[in-house]
Amino acid sequence: MLVLYGHSTQDVPETNARVVGGTEARRNSWPSQISLQYLSGGKWYHTCGGTLIRQNWVMTAAHCVDRTMTFRVVIGEHNLSQNDGTEQSASVQKIVVHPYWNSNDVSAGYDIALLRLAQKVTLNSYVQLGVLPQEGAILANNSPCYITGWGLTKTNGQLAQVLQQAYLPTVDYAICSSSSYWGSIVKKSMVCAGGDGIRSGCQGDSGGPLHCSVNGKYTVHGVTSFVSSLGCNVSRKPTVFTRVSAYITWINNVIASN
């Protein structure tokens, strides 16, 4: 059984991840990170992260846009509660969810969506495109990565106001799919990272990037998907990400045809 936006006593995946055990990111040090926000009662609220991949396209998790809402993207953001002077916002004009996504079964994979913005954002030192990996690229076990987001800073806690980052080394598929970790819930189309019981993603980080250092350059290898419903930072339950390198062709095709 899988839980979306809820809690269960069983150890099942729960979407909505956020950063636990992290530190405040240096201002605008992750310039492809976006805040996905929804409109409610005349105010905008952060719900998920995402990555700017073209000037008018954002990559996020499918489960972030399951519900019909008015969304906008804010980029160049650092502190959600104040105007940093570097932000740009754009309304979401079109949402393209992966055709195989099933909101009742996040463990099947395909937790990825692309958002076309109503206008192009301007690139500058605060706003940059995320670099995506090559199709099929698989990271070695214990590769150095960082998760970033404004998600909860502890299980059942509060959203972070300033962007957080946490070091989450990858856990390869052989280990992550073993019975003492996630078992068969994790698929080859996913990336696992963390699992030390201290640092993790948590609610509100979902859809955001896993930045991995490859040849000295940060590449977005993951889209934050789910954590254990027992808590965000559970030992041997790494944060699970959609593996971006499994979807490069799909991403390029969607952008080309829209």
From Swiss-Prot:
Active site annotation, chain numbering: H63 (charge relay system), D111 (charge relay system), S206 (charge relay system)
Propeptide: 9-18
S-S bridge residues: C48-C64, C145-C212, C176-C192, C202-C232
The reaction(s) this protein catalyses: Hydrolysis of proteins, including elastin. Preferential cleavage: Ala-|-Xaa
Keyword Metal-binding: yes
InterPro entries named among the record's database cross-references: Peptidase_S1_Elastase_sf, Peptidase_S1_PA, Peptidase_S1_PA_chymotrypsin, Peptidase_S1A, Trypsin_dom, TRYPSIN_HIS, TRYPSIN_SER
Superkingdom of the organism of origin: Eukaryota
Gene Ontology annotations for the cellular component aspect, listed alphabetically: extracellular space
Signal peptide stretch: 1-8
Residues annotated as binding Ca(2+): E77, N79, Q82, E87
UniProt cross-references to Gene3D superfamilies, sorted A to Z: Trypsin-like serine proteases (2.40.10.10)
Keywords tagged on the record: Calcium, Disulfide bond, Glycoprotein, Hydrolase, Metal-binding, Protease, Secreted, Serine protease, Signal, Zymogen
Enzyme Commission code(s) on record: 3.4.21.36
Primary role: Serine proteases that hydrolyze many proteins in addition to elastin.
Annotated family: Belongs to the peptidase S1 family. Elastase subfamily.
Entry-linked PANTHER family: CHYMOTRYPSIN-LIKE ELASTASE FAMILY MEMBER, CHYMOTRYPSIN-LIKE ELASTASE FAMILY MEMBER 1
Protein name per its UniProtKB record: Chymotrypsin-like elastase family member 1
